[in-house]
């Protein structure tokens, strides 16, 4: 028997499905929502519905967007010849914070992880290859996370992309190994971008 009423137990169970939210955090969030005004609870519910209804993936780079193509791909002042490959859409803001990158992005939506059953077919690689085919790109910067999975992904992509004749670089290890670039500060990310190397 649950120690909470069924609607509260259900909300806690749903909140626990969010990344980084354990049982205690889910309980705190659920009770915060319960104490909130009905208007605030409705605003939260509307925001969740809007995200699901109005956001989609950019048809070019796979970034999450409400317009297609996204603002990066549609911006004529950005260098379309330089593509920065990241694992997740949240990684883009880490690169943008440096104010030293004016190219475009490609979001893989993950990294290779054989232990977790994530192979190349689970990532958004095929449209990256189409973007570089026939000399459409001068350089591809592999800005995957400095983890075992991120390094494996970078190595895999490097082999494929070099066969297309494009320059392939990897961000420098100014970003600590085992971390997520989403949490890198501007200076660290800037140094990582400046110190990228050929693969």
UniProtKB/Swiss-Prot annotation:
InterPro entries reported for this sequence: DNA_Rcmb_RecR, Rcmb_RecR, Rcmb_RecR_Znf, TOPRIM_dom, TOPRIM_RecR
Family annotation (SMART domains): TOPRIM (SM00493)
PROSITE patterns membership: TOPRIM
Gene3D superfamilies: 3.30.60.80, 3.40.1360.10, 6.10.250.240, RecR Domain 1
Zinc finger extent (C4-type): 58-73
Disulphide-bonded residues: none
SUPFAM superfamilies for this protein: Recombination protein RecR
UniProt KW keywords: DNA damage, DNA recombination, DNA repair, Metal-binding, Zinc, Zinc-finger
Family: Belongs to the RecR family.
Matches recorded under NCBIfam families: recR
Protein name listed in UniProt: Recombination protein RecR
């Amino acid at each position: 028997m649950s120690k909470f009423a069924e609607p509260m137990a259900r909300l806690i169970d749903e909140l626990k499905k969010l990344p980084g939210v354990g049982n205690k955090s889910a309980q705190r969030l659920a009770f915060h929502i319960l104490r909130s005004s009905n208007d605030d609870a409705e605003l939260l519910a509307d925001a969740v519905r809007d995200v699901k209804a109005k956001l989609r993936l950019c048809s070019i780079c796979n970034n999450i967007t409400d317009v297609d193509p996204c603002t990066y791909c549609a911006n004529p002042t950005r260098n379309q010849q330089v593509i920065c490959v990241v694992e997740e859409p949240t990684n883009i803001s880490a690169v943008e914070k440096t104010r030293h990158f004016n190219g475009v992005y490609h979001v893989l939506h993950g990294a290779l992880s054989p232990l977790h059953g994530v192979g190349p077919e689970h990532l958004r690689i095929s449209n990256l290859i189409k973007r570089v085919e026939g000399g459409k790109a001068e350089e591809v910067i592999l800005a995957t996370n400095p983890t075992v999975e991120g390094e494996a992904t970078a190595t895999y992509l490097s082999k494929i992309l070099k066969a297309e004749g494009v320059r392939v670089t990897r961000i420098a290890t100014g970003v600590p190994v085992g971390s997520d670039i989403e949490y890198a500060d501007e200076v660290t990310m800037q140094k990582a971008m400046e110190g990228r190397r050929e693969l």
